């Protein structure tokens, strides 16, 4: 199984060299590899352009998007585009940028219908 984890950043105000892979998706990769060893190939992305290039080269079975207030709109646009271009890819999102109220969560998922699953804590 091919998996892409992405914690995307806006690239218009920074150089690519300064986009370090975030610890959060690094931890996810490490955990998944301990559980599934050789059954999964995981790639990590910070730059949205590199993510899209990788999709066109070899689309993954699963895309995990790390969701924060500073990248929610970027995730929305990239996720919608990916689902349109690569409908077989399952998209999972998660992170602290999710409202506690059930009605807000439902509204979020309706707006983000490209997301198959959203992982919340609590």
List the predicted regions and their residue ranges.
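A near-ubiquitous, low-amplitude feature marking generic local secondary-structure context
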Residues: 11, 15, 62-65
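Glycine- and acidic-residue-enriched helix-capping/strand-helix junction motifs
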Residues: 12-25
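N-terminal cofactor/phosphate-binding cores enriched in small/glycine residues
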Residues: 25, 31-32
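Glycine-rich beta-alpha loop elements in corrinoid/cobalamin-binding modules
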Residues: 31, 40-122
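Short loop/turn segments at strand-loop or loop-helix junctions that form parts
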Residues: 6-10
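Extreme N-terminal starter segment of soluble prokaryotic enzymes
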Residues: 1-4
């Amino acid at each position: 199984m091919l998996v892409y984890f992405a914690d995307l950043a806006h690239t218009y105000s920074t150089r690519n060299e300064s986009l370090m892979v975030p610890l959060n998706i690094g931890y996810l990769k490490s955990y998944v590899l301990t559980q599934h060893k050789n059954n999964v190939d995981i790639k990590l992305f910070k730059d949205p352009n590199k993510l899209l290039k990788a999709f066109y080269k070899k689309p993954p079975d699963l895309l995990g998007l790390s969701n924060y207030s500073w990248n929610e709109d970027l995730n929305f646009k990239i996720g919608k585009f990916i689902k349109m271009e690569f409908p077989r890819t399952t998209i999972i999102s998660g992170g602290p940028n999710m409202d506690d109220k059930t009605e807000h969560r439902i509204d979020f998922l309706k707006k983000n219908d490209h997301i198959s699953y959203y992982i919340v804590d609590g």
